[in-house]
Curated annotation (Swiss-Prot):
Protein name listed in UniProt: Alanine--tRNA ligase
Compartments in which it is found: Cytoplasm
Membership in a protein family: Belongs to the class-II aminoacyl-tRNA synthetase family.
EC id: 6.1.1.7
GO biological process, one term: alanyl-tRNA aminoacylation
Residues reported in the UniProt entry to bind Zn(2+): 595, 599, 703, 707
GO molecular function: alanine-tRNA ligase activity; aminoacyl-tRNA deacylase activity; ATP binding; tRNA binding; zinc ion binding
């Protein structure tokens, strides 16, 4: 952590207005105030809330929307451009799943100076999600997983200063005092250091009556490992908590009662819960706030707060538990709705894991309060409020309800398996057991604890259990970096970027280039190349290099930074040689059809299944390619048919396919973040591939692959197979062009073969199969009738061979028919105690429970075999055929039967 630069924080408003800088005796932080009698920093837990039931200021908003608009308008009037909110899923980043603050919108591309900001200065109100405090939600009175961070940002580039610390603090003070009507001496500025997303800087936490309402960060460090390096860009990064400001202005007992008041009232009616005593609620919120950050030591916290309030701790727990559950339902339902609306499908991996975590917590709390309504009713009730503030949720409302309903069904199924799962765990259940039960089966630890208690096993559930889970899954796992070659960046550091002829003309299959470097005898760097290097799910081109009358095969092509390296098999050219390049044109065209076909197929899937569909992975290859997409169930045959028809309509429409380089900001503003279907694209410019144009534009994506120039050149898109490969991910296997034709011809060949075997024409196969199935069913019914007669005959013979051993009836019988259903029915009608059936080298033992089948199997194994089983059934094999008399005699001699 860098040392706080005190001189930076001595702003002109503090000096000019006579603010006093003091050190808090409780937490040690310095703070600035106009209040001469203030003796602490003004933050929790150093001071209690002073606004509950007594809101500060003169401004009384009618709704939370009024506060948001007041903030944005305030900064618009002061030269800031209003910017629309970004999605809560950070598709433009590969280091985090979710947007946790407004600055996430501009990291890393703007903060690193790769691209300019969308406006400068700007103001925004960004929905954000943080699960670091998920276990505190509902308990502390102020924590949320989803919140809106209102902000104003300024990006100060070298030679182009916008504004810095003085103006930022003045804006904050003016907003809180003039716009909201707070007294000057009620606004405290606490010094601190902020760090996040690879950047850091000094900051002020803006506090009013015990609550932090905003953070003003002056970002000028880049964090690299343990080092803090000065950035060329100095960034004003502010965050004003919309919900917290609204809470303070209403003076409600908790942030939930302020923000979700309408929903909570409806939910209490729906669930049959009484409205709590606001005085007790207010007192509880004040005291729980002051116990923070130790608030998670719940047992001690409730006892301590109960003492302070003057009631019994058990009475307090009975009072707070239903309210805590309601607050969790309110917060989590909004957060999950935001996530699903922005394309998240609840699952057991990736960002979907985090959505499922919140839904499972809601279901757990529904269980705690004994709710008898489905979770979808909670969501439906809340969504009817949320769509007034977030109208975009209206379009996603049915999808949200469908996914929540599906998640509840999966949860109930998992819970039904709990007794069996717990029985497999020997001894005490550890935290790792609880984590594994949640990660593998989605069972909340509190439910595990209750089930374990029935078995006399005590389970301790950490109060921060869900925070532990979220921390394990909050970032994407880092894949292997670099290339597969024995070539490093140092090997090519002295070389210029390779000219990429494959982008200039994707139909250039031949060309000439100059050799710039030969590395280790087989890695060739040219000044330009028509060979496409592997990337974006598209394999590298193959072909040959010809020079000096010889030829070398190009077997692989990879990027090493901006340089393209060709791997050859054969003679090696010399530096300075001019080589003739020739790629396998048929293979390249096949891959181009597959890549353009992937874009068309993905867009067709989205149009049929819904806008929540995102690409989860792709591999373009020949003769088959795959496309993985996010979706919550396997598509129906009719949906697959519609997808294929839609894709081929685009092929037949002969739409143009064009690629162009665009500034990242311009592309995002024009097309939205949907351009990142294929993942994060680095750099200040992105290559946009557009299928169609004008009103006929079908698909737009950022893509670095090679594409056809018109859709008709694909010829045909044929979906071969559709599978669910994991929860929330569907895989489409497809083919295009001549490979699609080959696939159809192969199917026709199989159809002709079936027709020949059925002795019918190709168009009569379906009816012939129906007739065959009917005949087979009739034959099976006749077989069952005959089997029943055979069983009667076999039983008569078995009973004749029955012997008595230790008072029990035992029969050993050689059976020519080894059909499981037949044997089971035969055994069920056997009137004795032990039945041994032998077929060749195999045996089966059936008993009525008086004798253990496994004991009989152990005896039979002495004849040279192996087998095992349970109390009433066993099976095994003999190493060699055995005689019936040997089996009978062995049983008589060695089997000890006990009742």
């Amino acid at each position: 952590m860098p040392i706080l630069n005190e001189s930076l924080l001595r702003t002109r408003i503090f000096i000019g207005r006579g603010f006093r800088r003091s050190r808090c005796p409780y937490c040690g932080h310095h703070y600035w105030t106009l209040n001469p009698s203030q003796d602490n920093c003004g933050d929790q837990p150093c001071t209690p809330y002073g606004f509950i039931g007594n809101p500060p200021g003169t401004y009384r908003p009618e709704s939370i929307k009024d506060v948001r608009e007041r903030f944005l308008s305030f900064f618009e009037k002061r030269g800031h451009t209003r910017v629309a909110r970004y999605p809560v899923v950070a598709r433009w980043r590969n280091d985090v799943y979710l947007v946790g603050a407004s600055i996430y919108d501009f990291q890393p591309w703007v903060t690193e100076g790769v691209v300019p900001p969308p406006a400068n200065p700007l103001t925004i109100s960004q929905p954000s999600i943080r699960l670091t405090d998920v276990d505190k939600v509902g308990r502390s009175g102020r924590h949320l997983t989803g919140f809106e961070m209102m902000a104003h940002h300024a990006f100060n580039f070298p030679g182009k200063e916008i504004y810095w610390i003085n103006e930022t603090v003045e804006y904050a003070h003016e907003f809180f005092t003039r716009e909201l009507g707070f007294r000057d001496d009620e606004v405290t500025y606490k010094e601190n250091i902020w760090e996040g997303g690879g950047n850091a800087g000094e900051s002020f936490e803006v506090l009013v009556r015990g609550l932090e309402l905003a953070t003003l960060v002056f970002m000028h460090y880049r964090v690299i490992g343990d080092e803090y390096r000065e950035m060329p860009i100095r960034i004003v990064d502010t965050g004003y908590g919309l919900e917290r400001i609204y809470w303070v202005l209403t003076g409600k007992p908790t942030i939930y009662e302020a923000v979700f008041e309408g929903f909570l009232n409806k939910a209490r009616q729906l669930l049959g819960l009484p409205k709590p005593d606001e005085k007790v609620l207010a007192s509880l919120a004040i005291h729980m706030g002051q116990l923070d950050p130790e608030v998670l030591a719940l047992d001690k916290a409730y006892v301590e707060v109960a003492k302070r309030i003057g009631i019994d701790s058990s009475e307090l727990i009975n009072f707070i538990k239903p309210q805590e559950a309601l607050y969790v339902l309110a917060d989590h339902s909004r957060t999950v709705s935001w996530m699903i609306n922005d394309g998240v499908i609840p699952s057991n991996s990736g960002v979907g894991y985090l959505a499922r975590l919140l839904i499972r917590r809601m279901l757990k709390y529904m269980h705690v309060i004994g709710a008898q309504v489905p979770l979808t009713e909670i969501f439906n009730t809340h969504l009817n409020y949320l769509i007034n503030d977030y109208p975009e949720l209206k379009e996603s409302m049915q999808l949200i309800l469908d996914l929540v309903d599906l998640e509840e069904a999966k949860y109930k199924s998992a819970i039904s398996q709990l007794p069996k799962l717990i029985s497999r765990i020997k001894g005490e259940l550890t935290i790792n057991d609880l984590i594994n039960l949640y990660d593998s089966h989605g069972i909340p630890p509190e439910v595990v604890r209750d089930e374990a208690a029935k078995r006399g096993v005590k389970v301790n559930v950490p109060d921060n259990f869900y925070e532990m889970l979220a921390a394990r899954h909050q970032k994407p796992a880092k894949g292997e970096e670099g290339n597969r070659l024995d070539v490093t960046a140092d090997d090519v550091i002295d070389l210029p970027p390779t000219r990429e002829l494959f982008y200039e003309d994707t139909y250039a299959f031949e060309g000439k280039a100059k050799v710039l470097k030969v590395i280790k005898g087989k890695y060739i760097v040219l000044d330009s190349t028509i060979f496409y290097p592997e990337g974006g799910g598209q394999p590298a081109d193959r072909g040959v290099l010809r020079f000096n009358g010889v030829e070398a095969k190009v077997v692989d092509v990879q990027r090493v930074g901006p340089v393209i390296v060709h791997v050859i098999d054969g003679p090696t050219p010399g530096v300075g040689d001019v080589v003739e390049m020739r790629i396998d044109s048929e293979r390249r065209l096949g891959l181009m059809r597959m890549h353009t076909g992937t874009h068309i197929l993905l867009q067709s899937i989205r149009r049929v299944l819904g806008k929540h569909v995102w690409q989860a992975g792709a591999q373009k290859d020949i003769p088959l390619s795959r496309l993985d997409v996010t979706h919550y169930r396997l598509p129906t045959p009719d949906e697959v048919k519609r997808i294929e028809e839609l894709a081929n309509e685009v092929v037949l429409s002969d739409l143009p396919v064009k690629a162009e380089l665009m500034p990242r900001n311009e592309a995002e503003a024009k097309y939205g973040f949907i351009i990142y279907q294929g993942g994060v694209v680095p750099g200040g410019e992105v290559r946009i591939v557009k299928v169609g144009e004008g009103n006929d534009t079908y698909d737009v994506e950022a893509c670095g692959g090679t594409h056809l120039d018109r859709t008709s050149r694909i010829g045909l898109i044929k979906i071969v197979k559709v599978d669910k490969i994991q929860e929330g991910v569907i895989r489409f296997i497809f083919t295009t062009g001549k490979y699609a034709l080959d696939y159809v011809r192969n199917l026709e060949g199989k159809l002709d073969s079936a027709a020949s075997k059925l002795r019918v024409g190709r168009d009569e196969v379906d009816e012939a199969v129906d007739r065959l199935i009917k005949e087979l069913n009739n034959a099976e019914e006749r077989s069952r009738v005959l089997a029943r007669k055979a069983i009667e005959a076999d039983l008569a013979n078995i009973v004749k061979s029955m012997i008595t051993v230790s008072g029990f009836k035992v029969a050993v019988y050689y059976e020519d028919y080894w059909v499981r259903d037949y044997l089971q029915e035969l055994a069920s009608k056997y009137p004795g105690d032990v039945l041994v059936l032998i077929h060749g080298n195999e045996y089966q033992v059936y008993t009525n429970g008086k004798v253990k089948a496994i004991d009989v199997a152990k005896v039979l194994n002495e004849l040279g075999g192996k087998g095992g089983g349970s109390g009433t059934f066993a099976q095994g094999v003999f190493n060699n055929p055995v005689k019936q008399d040997d089996v009978v005699n062995t049983i008589k001699r060695k089997l000890t039967l006990t009742q």
